[in-house]
Regions:
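Nucleotide-activated chemistry modules centered on ATP-dependent adenylation/adenylyltransferase
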Residues: 1-38, 42-200
Length: 200
């Protein structure tokens, strides 16, 4: 079976737009969102949805939220972007990860974490009347873009809101996120949020 090119699908969808749809963009952190927002802001009215109960400990969550806000305040592509920050809800993540604490990054715990965060994003997109929802997670070379897109497409069906396919790491998206992080002085963490053993 031919592998899908999610980046090409997103480009084609954007090219077909005749208006500016509303997009709820799940963001894991400022650095990852930087290249995604730069690419999407010319075409969508965007609110960033910072829902990341997996980020442990709480001090790390606060730090990443601070740098997400900093990016939106400093970058020209962030000036018209809104920010929605639900409660951190660490309990929801610990329940989703129960029994999977020893899994390596990329394993079953990651899948459950994707489902948790994207489910909440899809719910918020439906409740808020957004046209699309998406995530910055596919900018990372460590994240499984086909899996993330499959989860997003299933949730789109379940919640009646459109999923924006993506593979933001393509077309040097990850490299661009590093460049923008340096440009705006962003804190770049070395792990996704939950992967350190002491967090469990």
């Amino acid at each position: 079976m031919q592998q899908r090119n999610y980046q090409r699908e997103m480009d084609a969808l954007i090219a077909s737009l005749d208006a500016r749809p509303r997009l709820l963009l799940h963001s894991c952190c400022g650095p990852c969102s930087s290249a995604c927002l730069e690419r999407l802001a010319p075409h969508f009215d965007i609110d960033v949805f910072f829902y990341n109960p997996n980020i442990l400990p709480a001090e790390e969550w606060e730090k990443r939220l601070f740098w997400q806000k900093h990016l939106l305040e400093m970058a020209p592509f962030g000036k018209d972007v809104g920010l929605i920050v639900p409660e951190r809800d660490e309990t929801a993540f610990r329940l989703a990860a129960a029994g999977l604490e020893a899994e390596a990054e990329g394993g079953a715990r990651c899948t459950e974490c994707f489902v948790l965060r994207l489910s909440r994003t899809a719910e918020a997109a439906r409740e808020g009347g957004y046209d699309y929802f998406a995530t910055t997670l596919t900018v990372s070379p460590h994240k499984n873009a086909p899996l993330i897109n499959a989860i997003g497409e299933k949730l789109a069906e379940d919640h009646g809101v459109l999923w924006l396919p993506s593979d933001f790491k393509k077309r040097d998206g990850y490299r661009r996120s590093i460049e923008l992080s340096h440009e705006y002085g962003l804190y770049r963490q070395s792990w996704c949020g939950c992967g350190l053993p002491e967090n469990f």
